[in-house]
C-alpha cells in the first residue's frame, strides 16, 4: 500500500546542514494502523510531512498505491492529496467557521458541488459523534470534540490514507482513549490505512498493528507490535516499552536477592491465551523449584493479552535447567536477569 524508500530530508542554512531524517525505508500494509514513535526531535513529524509532501524530501521515494509522489507534478500531487487525510495535534480549525463548515472546507477546495458537500458532511457528523454540533463554533468545543471535527474534515474527501501527527498529545487520558477508539472503528469499518505519529507508547499499545521506532533521524527498529514488545532489539525500543510495562526491580531488592543461594531471577513474557495458563503452579509441580513472584503485570496489545512475570526461582542447577526447558516448551520468552 505505502512504500517509503531511502527517504532523506536535510535542512540547509548558510552555516550548517541539519539531517532531519536519513535513509528511512518502510513498507506499510493496506489497512494497517502503523505507529511511528520517537522522542522529540527524532524526525517523526518531518517524516509524516514528507509522506504527503508538505515537506519536500531531499532524496528517496514515497510510493502510494503504485504511484511515486516524489515524481508528481503540482497538479498530480494536488489530486493525490485528496486521498491522503491528515489530523494534527492542535486541530487547526477555522475559528470563524462552524463545525459543519470546517468539515466542508476541503470539499469546497476540491470543487465539489453544494449538494454533494452537504450530503457528505451530514454523513460524517454522526460518524464522529457530533450530529448535534453542526452549527457550533470551535471556541464552544472541548479538545476532544475539536479533534473529532479534525478527523471528520480529514475524512471528507474519502481518503485511503490517514496521517495522524501527535493527534492525542494535547488531550487528557480519557479523551485520548475515546479518540483512539474512534480511529480504530474507522480503520475497521472502512479499511483505512492509518499512520500514527506519537511519542507515547501507550498509543501504540492501544491501537497499532505495526510500529517503527525512529531515533536520531533513523529507523532503530520496526515490525509487528507484538514482536517489538516481546523481543525489542534496540535500547530505545526497550525504554519506550518500559513506560507502559515497567519491569525493573529496585537495586536494593536485587542486592538482597543476591544473597539467596541457588537462586535465579528471571523475567517471563507471555502473549494471548498463555496469560490464563497456571504457569507458576505447573512449574513448581513439574520441576520441583520454588517460585517467588517479584513483579507481574498484564494488559492488552490491541485486543491481545500481554503480560510479564519476574520470578525468583530457587533450586539446584538441574532443577533450574528443567524449569527453563519447561518454559521453552510452552513458547514463553525467558530472560535471566540475575544468577546467584
From Swiss-Prot:
* Residue spans crossing the bilayer: none
Where's it mainly located? membrane
Instruction: Provide the ABC transporter domain boundaries.
Output: 2-241
Which E.C. number(s) belong to this protein? 7.4.2.11
**SMART domains in the cross-refs:** AAA, NIL
Membrane topology of the entry? Peripheral membrane protein
For this UniProt entry, the molecular function terms from Gene Ontology, in alphabetical order, are: ABC-type D-methionine transporter activity; ATP binding; ATP hydrolysis activity
Matching PROSITE patterns = ABC_TRANSPORTER_1, ABC_TRANSPORTER_2, METN
InterPro entries from the entry? AAA+_ATPase (IPR003593), ABC_transporter-like_ATP-bd (IPR003439), ABC_transporter-like_CS (IPR017871), ACT-like_dom_sf (IPR045865), MetN_ABC (IPR041701), MetN_ABC_transporter-like (IPR050086), NIL_domain (IPR018449), P-loop_NTPase (IPR027417)
GO CC annotation: plasma membrane
Which Pfam families does the protein's record reference? ABC_tran (PF00005), NIL (PF09383)
| Family of this protein | Belongs to the ABC transporter superfamily. Methionine importer (TC 3.A.1.24) family.
Q: What is this protein's function?
A: Part of the ABC transporter complex MetNIQ involved in methionine import. Responsible for energy coupling to the transport system.
Q: How does it assemble?
A: The complex is composed of two ATP-binding proteins (MetN), two transmembrane proteins (MetI) and a solute-binding protein (MetQ).
Recorded protein name is Methionine import ATP-binding protein MetN
- Read off the lineage from the record: Bacteria, Bacillati, Bacillota, Clostridia, Eubacteriales
